[in-house]
A protein has these predicted regions:
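Terminal RNA-binding accessory module
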Residues: 1-82, 394, 402
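Rossmann-like S-adenosyl-L-methionine
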Residues: 3-17, 228-497
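Short, acidic/hydrophobic/Gly-rich beta-strand patch recurrent on exposed beta strands
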Residues: 29-34, 156-159, 223-225, 381
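Short, conserved phosphate/pyrophosphate- and ester-handling motifs at nucleotide-, phospho-/glycolipid
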Residues: 46, 174, 320
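Extended interfacial segments that mediate partner engagement and assembly in macromolecular machines
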Residues: 66-78, 84-196, 215-217, 231
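Short, solvent-exposed loop/turn elements at beta->coil junctions and helix N-caps
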Residues: 124-134, 199-200, 207-212, 477-481
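Internal alpha/beta scaffold segment
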Residues: 165-207, 228-232, 236-263
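Carbohydrate-binding surface patches
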Residues: 210-214, 219-232
């Protein structure tokens, strides 16, 4: 194969002085050398750096900081002792007000460069940030891979740009109680000589330790993901590989009185999927209960008293309980505006998870249909409807790709569609269904500015004959649910044109 001719003379190993001009989606700082963008991990805008290039391509290069010549005014002291090696956070070295501003900028950049929309095309409102105490210890869920290395049980996060595991003993974005429970888990695996999973050989038992904590009462749920076929409890005690986990579970609950339950999740498959489809409760119950409460006087009394949510180990729920309320308030405001002329509004909530958005909107509307494919999340959602005495929410188990067209063409047509897809965004099937059958208004909740911008562009495209069957984004509100990282949520209200 012929070598690609480079339009520059940069070489791997070369050391350059670079001034960081911006931050990219992914967290890297970006500076330019002869017009070529250079991506630099752990950089801040305004840094003057000595950078060693380790990856040089035709259109970009990557470099590592050799020295900080002049630090940016945005730099801050990272609160976590693992930050320099851990891949969990990207922006702890940047002060929080600057983090929030850059996240808003990432949304603008994506809309402009991918979605083709400038400031004159859509209103991008100031970000709803977590300033005032919500910048640290906010995570209500964490998933820790487990390895056995040099006689030591490791559980934590993968290192920066690697598959090596960092044994996290203190994490500044999760509650201290999680640190304590994780440490006990490591000790118990060692005590009972439980084999950690070896991904390369597909051998060993414990793959992950997952922890979920309620911010309402501090209770925790611990889940051990094991490399084993699903077992019923009747056969469980005859299996020597698994019965040891019952001892681990009992000791864990004895050591931490705030643990509500210990669950075994079975995942015998190769690959990087974390959870399997089947679980077994070893001790206690299979869920914790969260309460989301608004302080706004203009919200319904039920939401001021608090929306109760049952969360099992595998159910999707926002990882930041406090900022989830801010996001839900924004969704409700947009929904009220969109439905102002509807006498008995009907809402479809796609990718509903445990029903957080559906249940939050239920006091404002006549009825909500929540679509979710995860059976455990649907079970939690139905339980949450009963828990909150909400009788106008129906849960439909199934893939959004298959259920959405049917729901929007049969029976009572929805007045509003809410979509909250995973990071990969909306599939072509869902985009087509929305354009063909969707209601006048759509609210799009996104956790990825890149796929959001792509989908907004696709939803705004006119038909092959130029017919107007698309949607225009009217307002976008970024929300920070992930301080110390580059991740940012956005809530968008779209209207048919």
């Amino acid at each position: 194969l012929a070598k690609v001719k480079l339009a520059h003379d940069l070489k791997r190993g070369e050391v350059l002085e670079i001034v960081v001009e911006s931050l990219a989606n992914g967290g890297d700082g970006v500076g330019k050398v002869a017009g070529l963008p250079v991506f630099i991990d752990r950089a801040a805008v305004g840094d003057k750096l000595k950078v060693r290039l380790f990856d040089v391509r035709k259109d970009f290069a990557r470099g590592a900081i050799e020295a900080i010549i002049e630090p940016s005014k945005e730099r801050a002291q990272p609160p976590c002792k693992h930050f320099e090696v851990c891949g969990g956070c990207q922006w702890q070295h940047i002060n929080y007000s600057a983090q929030a501003a850059h996240k808003e900028g990432l949304v603008r950049q994506a809309l402009k460069h991918i979605g083709g929309q400038g400031d004159n095309d859509v209103v991008i409102e100031p970000i709803a940030d977590a300033a005032g105490g919500g910048e640290l210890h906010y995570r209500n869920k964490a998933q820790f891979p487990v390895q056995y290395v040099d006689g030591q049980y490791l559980a934590g996060y993968y290192g920066r740009g690697s598959h090596s595991l960092i044994n996290v003993t203190e994490c500044s974005i999760q509650p201290p109680a999680m640190d304590q429970v994780l440490d006990t888990c490591r000790q118990l695996l060692k005590k009972y000589k439980v084999h950690a999973y070896d991904e390369a050989k597909h051998k060993g038992l414990v793959r992950h330790i997952n922890l979920r904590q309620s911010f309402a009462d501090g209770k925790l749920l611990a889940t051990f993901v094991v490399n084993h076929e699903a077992q019923k409890y009747s056969k469980f005690k005859d299996n020597q590989d698994l019965v040891v986990m019952l001892d681990v579970a009992r000791d864990l609950v004895d050591a931490h009185k705030n643990i509500e339950g210990v669950v075994l999740n079975f995942n015998p498959e190769k690959g990087n999927r974390i959870l399997g489809d089947d679980s077994l409760v070893l001790v206690g119950i299979e869920y914790v209960e969260e309460v989301l409460k608004t302080k706004r006087a203009d919200m319904p009394q039920k939401l001021r008293e608090g929306l109760k949510l049952r969360l099992s180990s595998s159910s999707f729920f926002q990882v930041n309980s406090v900022q989830a309320v801010a996001l839900l308030e924004i969704v409700a405001d947009m929904a009220k505006s969109a439905l102002a002329d509807c006498a008995a509004p009907v809402v479809v909530d796609a990718y509903a998870g445990v029903g957080t958005i559906a249940l939050w909107l239920s006091p404002f509307v006549h009825s909500v249909v929540a679509v979710e494919e995860n059976k455990d999340a649907v079970s939690d959602g139905r339980a949450n409807s009963l828990l909150n005495d909400l009788t106008n929410v129906e849960f439909v188990e199934g893939r959004v790709e298959e259920a959405l067209s049917r729901l929007m063409t049969e029976g009572t047509l929805p007045d509003l569609l809410v979509v909250d897809p995973p990071r990969k965004g909306l599939s072509p099937e869902v985009l087509a269904a929305i354009k063909e059958h969707g209601p006048r208004h759509v609210i799009y909740v996104s956790c990825n500015p890149t796929t959001l911008a792509r989908d907004l562009k696709l939803l705004s495209d006119k038909g092959e004959k130029g017919e107007s069957n698309g949607y225009k984004a009217k307002r976008i509100k970024p929300v920070d649910l992930f301080p110390q990282t580059y991740h940012v949520e956005s809530v968008v209200i779209l209207e048919r044109f």
